[in-house]
A protein has these predicted regions:
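Helix N-cap / beta->alpha transition motif
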Residues: 94-105, 158-159, 199, 275, ...
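Extended alpha-helical interface modules used as scaffolds for assembling large macromolecular complexes
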Residues: 214-529, 533-538, 545-548, 559-577
Length: 577
């Protein structure tokens, strides 16, 4: 048993709950760890494996400070964080297990890094174009996730099938994982049950201007940076990022990914220089997109509607208009001038999401430079007339019922093999199913039946197939039960508790102890005892000098030291009352 754990255990017992929770989280402690008391916690935190896991997480300044402390120098201002991580004692010195682990690693070196060179006009223009492309690609990604959650692999990357589907929109496949990471940091997407889903905040972000979208993304990107890259409210020069976690073998790959996201957001130019709009962010100020906005194409608020059921936007369509138009039509091409196509399915989808024929036609009339062509008006009105021919609702008995004035439709649904999982049964009033109302509705919709959910009052209901979760930061482990358990086992006398642990360890290892006993007359006597048992408040063992078995009251033991056989009466560990 390590004697170095004893002072750490005392410090842990005196620390507030919040400080303990922060320490356990930073050191990667499981909330359900089977520690019995603070001595267990201290020993676990000083185990070589635990220390080896903690060191790679130290940013450069703390790694340098810890190395200074190991070398016998003052850790300086970074002593506080290292003490909070239980890598330094409260006096600023490292415990021997920490010193041993640090000594085995290379010396970290810190150096001043000047700010990056400002971008010239050409490099800034390319960075602005990339930022614009990234914002548009993220909007596509969020819209796709709103319609159908995106499948994730076990490691958190997008599944290959999803990448192929997204790449069909024109987004470069190699950027998709970085785009998803940017969206997650911004709270637009969230990973749930190995699926990437759009959050509640995604809808409002989609309706913002391109510069406002970019502002939200880059400020979230900054907030999510690892603490080793932060400089106050801003970040360190990007040229210094690679050196910030000197003891982490995974950092080069992580740093490369973070730098690529910064490049995608237009915060780093291709030549490594810094565009004008990145400077306030690096310095910790709010984002100022004015200089970026000057390099972005002007957004338009009108489109050309054509007789072939297509729409042409002569420039980047304002995001709010683009989002609504894409709920009604399929976007066929995405560029500074985009094209959209209206189909019966796309209009039906809009009606399903809550639009009406009147709202669709009013919207198109408002943004069209060419009026509404007759073929498009006919498509909308005909689709609207057909929509809702099939009504889905829950009857008084709790079963799902499918009704329609068109008996032919009911007959078709009754024999449709695609609907077999619903087990539809025909009766005089239509079809019934044991499946839930929403399940029946979406299955019919996927099979392209003009279905509509109606409530108890017979009015249409709009149901979101993939309700967006609220954006919340990942829940931190709950260490309160663990801390409460450790405090319950915390006795009033830390010295006595430590002695008990030393004696238990000696019995388990059948060690030879040099025991100091307090005699009834107040004097002290030392015995060499081969520990054999502990119980009932008594220590049992063979007295080496007298070669007899002795039973000693634990309350009379002042101290116990494990004797190193190779050193005669040398001591290797100490427990004192």
């Amino acid at each position: 048993m390590s004697t170095h754990a004893r002072p750490l255990a005392v410090w842990l017992a005196q620390a507030p709950d919040a400080q303990l929770a922060a320490l356990f989280e930073a050191r990667g402690v499981r909330a359900d760890v089977a520690w019995s008391d603070f001595f267990d916690a201290a020993e676990a935190l000083l185990e070589p494996a635990s220390i080896e896991r903690a060191l790679p997480r130290l940013p450069l300044t703390e790694a340098v400070a810890l190395r200074r402390s190991v070398n016998g120098d003052d850790a300086g201002d970074d002593a506080g964080p290292l003490i909070a991580l239980a890598l330094l004692r409260p006096d600023g010195t490292p415990a021997p297990p920490v010193a041993e682990a640090v000594t085995a690693r290379q010396d970290p070196t810190a150096s001043e890094t000047p700010p990056p060179e400002p971008s010239d006009e050409s490099a800034a223009a390319r960075a602005a174009e990339r930022a614009f492309t990234t914002v548009a690609a993220l909007a596509d990604l969020v819209l796709l996730a709103s319609d159908t959650p995106l499948a994730l692999l076990t490691g958190g990357a997008l599944a290959s099938g999803e990448k192929r589907r997204i790449a069909a929109t024109g987004t470069a496949p190699e950027t998709l994982d970085d785009l998803a990471a940017i969206a997650v940091d911004a709270g637009l997407l969230a990973a749930l049950d190995r699926r990437l889903v759009a959050t509640e905040s995604a809808d409002s972000w989609l309706r913002e201007s391109a510069s406002a979208r970019w502002t939200g993304l880059v400020q979230a990107f900054r907030a999510a940076l690892p603490r080793g890259l932060r400089d106050g409210d801003g970040w360190l020069p990007t040229t210094a990022w690679a050196a910030q976690y000197p003891w982490s073998t995974a950092w080069p790959e992580q740093c490369s990914a973070i730098a690529e996201r910064a490049r995608l957001l237009g915060l780093i130019a291709d030549d490594g220089s810094e565009p004008e709009w990145a400077v306030p962010l690096r310095e910790g100020a709010p984002a100022d997109p004015a200089s970026l906005q000057r390099m972005l194409p002007t957004e338009v608020d009108r489109i050309f509607l054509q007789n072939d059921l297509t729409a042409i936007a002569p420039g980047p369509l304002q995001p709010a208009l683009d989002v609504r138009l894409r709920r009604i039509a399929v976007r066929e091409s995405a560029a500074q001038a985009s094209s959209y196509r209206f189909t019966a399915d796309s209009v039906a989808q809009a009606l399903t999401s809550g639009e009406t024929a009147a709202s669709i036609l009013d919207f198109l009339a408002e943004i069209s430079l060419t009026g509404i062509p007759q073929p498009l008006e006919y498509l909308v009105t005909q689709t609207d007339q057909r929509h809702g021919l099939v009504r889905v609702f829950t009857d008084a008995s709790g079963r799902t019922r499918v009704a329609s004035v068109d008996a032919t439709l009911l007959d078709a649904m009754g024999v449709d093999q695609a609907l077999r999982p619903l087990a539809l049964a025909r009766d005089a009033d239509g079809l019934t199913s044991r499946a839930g109302r929403d399940t029946v509705y979406w299955t019919l919709t996927d099979a392209r039946y003009p279905a509509m959910i109606v409530g108890d009052d017979g009015r249409p209901l709009v149901v979101d197939r993939n309700p967006a979760p609220g954006h919340a930061p990942p829940a931190a482990p709950d260490y309160l039960p663990l801390i409460a358990r450790l405090r319950e086992r915390q006795g009033p006398d830390a010295d006595a508790a430590w002695l008990d642990r030393e004696l238990e360890a000696a019995v388990r290892s059948k060690a030879v102890l040099l025991v100091e006993i307090e005699m009834p007359d107040g004097t002290a006597r030392e015995l060499q005892l081969e520990a054999s048992g502990l119980g009932g408040g008594r220590l049992r063992g063979r007295d080496r000098a007298a070669d007899v078995e002795r039973t000693l009251p634990v309350r009379s033991i002042r101290s116990a030291r494990v004797i190193d056989p190779s050193a005669g009466s040398g001591a290797t560990a100490t427990g004192e009352r």
